[in-house]
């Protein structure tokens, strides 16, 4: 039987000093025989997705103690990408993922914790904690803060979210009063932004990986039903500890659950629901921590066979996360995939013996369990609040229409090709990614003239100054993990293209990345990035670029000889932006850039540079 890790600091005469300190935290004699379970919280008043988490760690802690464990809570940082966007703050967003992963590792290993409950929610927090959990490989369960309710206003016939406020603000024809109304209405409650953006995508993917409870990704932050997820997580983590430490059952460990097939399941879910392209970055990073050989080629392979079964904002205005929940949540999408013969259903989860068993219990089209049906009727109250579990509104009916509803069957898919695609070509030899769910059919094949910008800032200025015309392909480079550094999100450029009426008339290619709120022909993660000698750094104004999503290709239409000559010239100049960029790159960011790999590797640290240290 494996010993509790915590015995290192709780047992033996020589640990009298450590026990004295443990006692000072409130532990008693009997507690030194129990598992010490770390609660990694991410409460902060900076982020609406985390503003309600302050007391939830202690809610879980009390449940852990009732179930026979010892709970010890700590906090990680959390960056709000929406607030950090559009200025140098965005340089810190992706690097914060590594900081969060390291912080969880530091706290758990320094104090010899036996297991972890990860309370996450927004963009880089769930991925960072996931990386740490797979790195540590001790019992873990994820429970997130939940999605925000969609905004409501009389000025729009559909629900609102953050992107609506950004787009309307850039529309010169919109009155100040309309902009103010959208601003006040777009983000009405606590929780992660209400569309299928990065935060919600990742919280849904933890369900598919088998590391979170059903409903984790879709139950509203404001709804009273979400409290049960936190309480159940507290009980479940103690049970996982008993199975591993008491019964030598290694099948409950995160690397046993989140194996190669589980990563395929998660990616198939992502493709089926048209999730954020950032999820590709984060799944690749998590796979490396799990020592799972899952890469961009696997994602490309899956993207060709998985249909799109769900459309949510920003890909369609009609649906938000509250509508996904009403349609049965993630296990209903997984159920559709399973019935289509696509899903691996023999895998265990933290809550069920197999994914097949979980689908039978939680897919609303497969169960008559009234409690499950009631759970998925949880809906929005439409009352602005920053308080968790503050309302108990329910829909009168479920959306179980798999032909025309929010979630579809394979036979009635929105499209037979999924919502994400990987493109390859001479401009991105190691690949780039596009959220096809947000691309209009008329521009799936697009040839245009390159319009070069050496930074997101200059691109924003150029778009707002009407320098970008219909038929252009906006190239934003030196914004990758090294070149930024930090791989900024490009939500402002894409939002401004929409506001200028160019959403279906232009494309955008970058070695940076996109917010989950991005739609349109927006292609990111070009690898290798410009700062690493990628061909995106060789494109010149006016060059023809051909994008062919059906054939998964993207090519700069110049000869190989010309590209080779340009590379020789660029090697002499150095792979740096042609313009001076007035951004402050601190020591912390320089340290991140030094080890960062390109996006096709998940923008993780280059471990080869650390070998031998």
UniProtKB/Swiss-Prot annotation:
Catalytic activity reported: (2R)-2,3-dihydroxy-3-methylbutanoate = 3-methyl-2-oxobutanoate + H2O; (2R,3R)-2,3-dihydroxy-3-methylpentanoate = (S)-3-methyl-2-oxopentanoate + H2O
Keyword entries, A-Z: 2Fe-2S, Amino-acid biosynthesis, Branched-chain amino acid biosynthesis, Iron, Iron-sulfur, Lyase, Magnesium, Metal-binding
Active site, per annotation: 515 (proton acceptor)
Binding sites annotated in the UniProt record for Mg(2+): 81, 123-124, 489
E.C. number: 4.2.1.9
SUPFAM superfamilies linked: IlvD/EDD N-terminal domain-like, LeuD/IlvD-like
CC terms in the record's Gene Ontology section: cytosol
Pathway of action: Amino-acid biosynthesis; L-isoleucine biosynthesis; L-isoleucine from 2-oxobutanoate: step 3/4; Amino-acid biosynthesis; L-valine biosynthesis; L-valine from pyruvate: step 3/4
PTM annotation (N6-carboxylysine): residues: 124
Cofactor: how and how many bound: Binds 1 [2Fe-2S] cluster per subunit. This cluster acts as a Lewis acid cofactor.
GO molecular function, one term: dihydroxy-acid dehydratase activity
Cofactor: [2Fe-2S] cluster; Mg(2+)
InterPro entries associated with the record: Dihydro-acid_dehy_C, DihydroxyA_deHydtase, DiOHA_6PGluconate_deHydtase_CS, ILV_EDD_C, ILV_EDD_N, IlvD/EDD_N
A family per Pfam: ILVD_EDD_N
Binding residues annotated for [2Fe-2S] cluster, in chain numbering: 122, 193
GO biological process per UniProt: isoleucine biosynthetic process; L-valine biosynthetic process
NCBIfam families hit by this protein: ilvD, PRK12448.1
Family: Belongs to the IlvD/Edd family.
Subunit field text: Homodimer.
Function statement: Functions in the biosynthesis of branched-chain amino acids. Catalyzes the dehydration of (2R,3R)-2,3-dihydroxy-3-methylpentanoate (2,3-dihydroxy-3-methylvalerate) into 2-oxo-3-methylpentanoate (2-oxo-3-methylvalerate) and of (2R)-2,3-dihydroxy-3-methylbutanoate (2,3-dihydroxyisovalerate) into 2-oxo-3-methylbutanoate (2-oxoisovalerate), the penultimate precursor to L-isoleucine and L-valine, respectively.
Name of this chain's protein: Dihydroxy-acid dehydratase
Species per Swiss-Prot/TrEMBL record: Pseudomonas entomophila (strain L48)
Taxonomic lineage from the root: Bacteria, Pseudomonadati, Pseudomonadota, Gammaproteobacteria, Pseudomonadales
Encoding gene (name): ilvD
